Curated annotation (Swiss-Prot):
Keywords tagged on the record: Cytoplasm, Elongation factor, Protein biosynthesis
Signal peptide feature range: none
Protein name as annotated: Elongation factor P
GO biological-process terms attached to the record: peptide biosynthetic process
Length: 185
């Protein structure tokens, strides 16, 4: 059992016969009254998003999730194909199931696919990836009081904020959990 105060991004649980994963959460402690947890939930099976508020004392049934590392093969425009590296079985997934991870996945990269009762419902990119910058704004020198950042587009099409010294053609390491630049490789 999970208590309402244990809800975090990525937590998966059963509620009212449905399975939900937490997309976003906020612990609220008002000046008057009891604390509560405001969440944005995605229905794992149907794909819909809903807002729900929980008390910290609410008890929720944890869903049993299988995690399997698979290789991203290619996209045909509508579906994204992943291969089990043990059985060589290929599974197609639609954009709703890969939406956050696909920004950082290149062909032949490994990713973790989450399954609930044999049904794939989510893709997680590796925590850190190294990608080539294909487009980058020119560096403009100026009187900046803080670290100056500029926009860069990496080979997967994702947009990342990078420091001024990074140029087109550089390879950078990105934290896929936050989408932030980590370092130049």
């Amino acid at each position: 059992m999970i208590s309402g105060s244990d809800l975090r991004k990525g937590t998966t649980f059963e509620l009212d016969g449905q399975v939900y994963t937490v997309i976003d959460f906020l612990h609220v402690k008002p000046g008057k009254g009891a604390a509560f947890v405001r969440t944005k939930l995605r229905n794992v099976i149907m794909g819909g998003v809903t807002d729900r508020t929980f008390n910290p004392t609410d008890k929720l049934q944890e869903a049993i999730i299988e995690r399997k590392e698979m290789q991203y093969l290619y996209s045909d425009g509508e579906l994204y194909y992943f291969m089990d590296q043990e059985t060589f079985e290929q599974i197609p997934l639609n954009h709703e199931k890969v939406e956050d991870a696909i920004k950082f996945l290149k062909e032949n990269m490994n990713a973790v696919i989450k399954f609930y009762k044999g049904e794939a419902f989510s893709v997680e990119a590796p925590n850190f990836v190294e990608l080539l910058i294909t487009e980058c704004e020119p560096s403009v020198k100026g009187n900046t009081a803080t670290t100056a950042m500029k926009t860069a587009v990496v080979e997967t099409g994702a947009t990342v904020m990078v420091p001024m010294f990074v140029e087109e053609g550089n390879t950078i390491r990105i934290d896929t959990r936050t989408g932030e630049y980590m370092e130049r490789v």
